[in-house]
Amino acid sequence: MKPSMITRTVTGTISGYTVTKETTMKQIDTAQLDITACQAQAAEYHARGFNCAQAVACTLAPAVGLDPQVAFTLTEGFGAGMGGMTETCGAISGAVAIMGFVMSDGMENPKTKGQTYKLSREIAKRFGEKNTTTVCGTLKGIGSDKGPLRSCPGCIDDAVEIACDVLKQLAE
Protein backbone atom coordinates (compact mmCIF):
# COMPACT_ATOMS: atom_id res chain seq x y z
CA MET A 1 0.00 0.00 0.00
CA LYS A 2 1.53 3.29 -1.09
CA PRO A 3 0.60 6.26 1.09
CA SER A 4 -1.38 9.07 -0.46
CA MET A 5 0.85 12.09 -0.82
CA ILE A 6 0.14 15.78 -0.82
CA THR A 7 2.58 18.52 -1.73
CA ARG A 8 2.22 21.76 0.13
CA THR A 9 3.94 24.02 2.56
CA VAL A 10 2.87 23.27 6.08
CA THR A 11 3.79 25.73 8.79
CA GLY A 12 2.11 25.62 12.12
CA THR A 13 2.64 25.76 15.81
CA ILE A 14 1.87 22.76 17.94
CA SER A 15 2.11 23.58 21.64
CA GLY A 16 4.83 26.15 21.10
CA TYR A 17 6.82 24.21 18.49
CA THR A 18 6.82 25.68 15.01
CA VAL A 19 6.72 22.96 12.40
CA THR A 20 7.43 23.72 8.76
CA LYS A 21 7.26 21.07 6.10
CA GLU A 22 7.84 22.48 2.63
CA THR A 23 7.89 19.27 0.66
CA THR A 24 5.75 16.20 0.28
CA MET A 25 3.83 14.99 3.31
CA LYS A 26 1.79 11.87 3.72
CA GLN A 27 -1.93 12.53 3.60
CA ILE A 28 -3.52 12.25 7.04
CA ASP A 29 -7.05 10.86 7.12
CA THR A 30 -8.46 12.65 10.15
CA ALA A 31 -11.70 10.64 9.90
CA GLN A 32 -9.67 7.69 11.21
CA LEU A 33 -8.39 9.65 14.22
CA ASP A 34 -11.38 9.51 16.55
CA ILE A 35 -9.62 9.29 19.91
CA THR A 36 -12.12 6.97 21.59
CA ALA A 37 -12.20 4.58 18.62
CA CYS A 38 -8.41 4.62 18.32
CA GLN A 39 -8.00 3.94 22.04
CA ALA A 40 -10.39 0.99 21.78
CA GLN A 41 -8.48 -0.40 18.77
CA ALA A 42 -5.15 -0.01 20.55
CA ALA A 43 -6.54 -1.73 23.65
CA GLU A 44 -7.72 -4.62 21.49
CA TYR A 45 -4.30 -4.95 19.88
CA HIS A 46 -2.59 -4.88 23.28
CA ALA A 47 -4.98 -7.53 24.61
CA ARG A 48 -4.01 -9.71 21.62
CA GLY A 49 -0.35 -9.55 22.67
CA PHE A 50 0.94 -6.55 20.76
CA ASN A 51 3.52 -4.58 22.75
CA CYS A 52 2.71 -0.97 23.64
CA ALA A 53 4.58 0.47 20.64
CA GLN A 54 2.89 -1.93 18.25
CA ALA A 55 -0.56 -1.22 19.69
CA VAL A 56 -0.13 2.53 19.16
CA ALA A 57 1.61 2.40 15.77
CA CYS A 58 -0.71 -0.22 14.26
CA THR A 59 -3.74 1.77 15.40
CA LEU A 60 -2.53 5.02 13.83
CA ALA A 61 -1.01 3.48 10.69
CA PRO A 62 -4.18 3.42 8.54
CA ALA A 63 -4.79 7.13 9.14
CA VAL A 64 -1.41 7.99 7.61
CA GLY A 65 -1.41 5.40 4.81
CA LEU A 66 1.04 3.00 6.44
CA ASP A 67 0.41 -0.73 6.25
CA PRO A 68 -0.26 -1.89 9.85
CA GLN A 69 1.82 -5.03 9.20
CA VAL A 70 4.82 -2.82 8.43
CA ALA A 71 4.15 -0.75 11.55
CA PHE A 72 3.94 -3.98 13.56
CA THR A 73 7.29 -5.30 12.38
CA LEU A 74 9.11 -1.97 12.67
CA THR A 75 8.02 -1.39 16.26
CA GLU A 76 8.51 -4.91 17.60
CA GLY A 77 11.77 -4.04 19.37
CA PHE A 78 10.36 -0.98 21.13
CA GLY A 79 8.21 -2.85 23.66
CA ALA A 80 8.85 -2.88 27.40
CA GLY A 81 10.79 0.35 27.23
CA MET A 82 13.05 -0.42 24.26
CA GLY A 83 13.69 -4.12 24.02
CA GLY A 84 12.73 -4.88 27.60
CA MET A 85 15.19 -2.38 29.11
CA THR A 86 12.33 -0.40 30.72
CA GLU A 87 13.61 2.88 29.27
CA THR A 88 11.40 5.11 27.05
CA CYS A 89 7.78 3.97 27.17
CA GLY A 90 6.92 1.89 24.12
CA ALA A 91 3.62 3.71 23.65
CA ILE A 92 5.57 6.93 23.09
CA SER A 93 7.94 5.12 20.73
CA GLY A 94 5.01 3.87 18.65
CA ALA A 95 3.61 7.39 18.34
CA VAL A 96 7.03 8.78 17.44
CA ALA A 97 7.48 6.12 14.74
CA ILE A 98 4.26 7.32 13.12
CA MET A 99 5.46 10.94 13.22
CA GLY A 100 8.65 9.88 11.45
CA PHE A 101 6.64 8.16 8.75
CA VAL A 102 4.43 11.21 8.23
CA MET A 103 7.17 13.84 8.22
CA SER A 104 10.07 12.09 6.49
CA ASP A 105 10.89 12.64 2.85
CA GLY A 106 12.99 9.49 2.92
CA MET A 107 16.60 8.87 2.09
CA GLU A 108 16.66 11.43 -0.71
CA ASN A 109 16.04 14.30 1.73
CA PRO A 110 17.27 13.49 5.23
CA LYS A 111 16.81 17.13 6.28
CA THR A 112 13.22 16.52 7.38
CA LYS A 113 14.35 14.91 10.63
CA GLY A 114 14.37 18.26 12.44
CA GLN A 115 10.61 18.53 12.02
CA THR A 116 10.18 14.95 13.18
CA TYR A 117 12.30 15.67 16.25
CA LYS A 118 10.08 18.63 17.14
CA LEU A 119 6.96 16.46 16.97
CA SER A 120 8.69 13.68 18.90
CA ARG A 121 9.65 16.10 21.67
CA GLU A 122 6.09 17.42 21.75
CA ILE A 123 4.67 13.92 22.18
CA ALA A 124 7.18 13.01 24.89
CA LYS A 125 6.68 16.35 26.66
CA ARG A 126 2.91 16.06 26.76
CA PHE A 127 3.09 12.42 27.85
CA GLY A 128 5.56 13.31 30.61
CA GLU A 129 3.38 16.17 31.82
CA LYS A 130 0.41 13.84 32.01
CA ASN A 131 2.25 10.96 33.71
CA THR A 132 5.24 12.68 35.42
CA THR A 133 7.71 10.53 33.45
CA THR A 134 8.33 8.89 30.09
CA VAL A 135 10.37 6.01 31.54
CA CYS A 136 8.69 2.61 31.29
CA GLY A 137 10.23 1.21 34.47
CA THR A 138 9.15 4.21 36.52
CA LEU A 139 5.66 4.12 35.02
CA LYS A 140 5.40 0.42 35.88
CA GLY A 141 6.69 1.03 39.40
CA ILE A 142 9.74 -1.20 39.01
CA GLY A 143 11.90 -0.79 42.11
CA SER A 144 9.29 1.37 43.82
CA ASP A 145 7.39 0.61 46.99
CA LYS A 146 4.55 2.81 45.73
CA GLY A 147 3.60 0.60 42.79
CA PRO A 148 2.94 1.68 39.22
CA LEU A 149 2.25 5.27 38.26
CA ARG A 150 0.36 4.23 35.14
CA SER A 151 -0.57 0.88 33.64
CA CYS A 152 0.47 -0.09 30.11
CA PRO A 153 -3.15 0.26 28.90
CA GLY A 154 -3.27 3.73 30.42
CA CYS A 155 0.01 4.69 28.75
CA ILE A 156 -1.32 3.42 25.43
CA ASP A 157 -4.49 5.49 25.86
CA ASP A 158 -2.43 8.60 26.60
CA ALA A 159 -0.04 8.12 23.68
CA VAL A 160 -2.93 7.51 21.27
CA GLU A 161 -4.76 10.61 22.49
CA ILE A 162 -1.67 12.81 22.15
CA ALA A 163 -0.68 11.39 18.75
CA CYS A 164 -4.22 11.77 17.37
CA ASP A 165 -4.22 15.40 18.49
CA VAL A 166 -0.83 16.11 16.92
CA LEU A 167 -1.80 14.39 13.65
CA LYS A 168 -5.06 16.36 13.48
CA GLN A 169 -3.14 19.60 13.99
CA LEU A 170 -0.71 18.64 11.23
CA ALA A 171 -3.59 17.94 8.86
CA GLU A 172 -5.12 21.40 9.35
Spans of model-derived segments:
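Phosphate-handling active-site elements
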Residues: 63-74, 101-119
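A short glycine/serine-rich beta->alpha loop
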Residues: 40-47, 78-86, 143-149
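Short, Lys/Arg-enriched N-terminal segments with co-localized hydrophobic residues
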Residues: 13-24
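DPxDG-like acidic metal-binding loop motif
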Residues: 94-102
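C-terminal binding/interaction regions
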Residues: 115-172
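Conserved phosphate/anionic-ligand binding catalytic regions in large, soluble enzymes, centered on
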Residues: 86-94
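Polybasic, low-complexity association/targeting segments
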Residues: 24-48
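Acidic-glycine-rich active-site phosphate/pyrophosphate-binding loop
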Residues: 26-32, 59-77, 130-137
